[in-house]
Amino acid sequence: MSALPDAAAWRGAAARFGGLFEPLDAGARVGLIPRANPASMLLWEVGAQGVAARVAPFPGFASCGVDMLLSADPESMDRILDAVGGDLFAALRADIRQGGVVCYMLRRRCDLEARGFEDLLEALGFAFMGACR
């Protein structure tokens, strides 16, 4: 089973791609879990001082408290580990397209847009078009 990336490296990735995180409202959270038997999740959390990263228990989809959750199979998690210091979003986008990473939107599209997720979602390969319904 692949380990989650180091929280400091995950925070560094957010800093390198700061333009994707700047529009996010304080309190916005993105989680990463291994697909098989997740006990912990790695979080990006937006706060007043910017984006923090930390490992937290994963209590399940319904109560994990994130806006978006990325679930990676072992091979994709290995690629994420390799890419965390480089072009992480290209790796995530490729694995989402190939099905190795499943992206769960745990908020309605309108809520994600209102919280500033549009650029981040576009970087992951999701384009929202049209009026929010």
Regions found by a protein language model. Give the residues of each.
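Feature captures hydrophobic
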Residues: 1-133
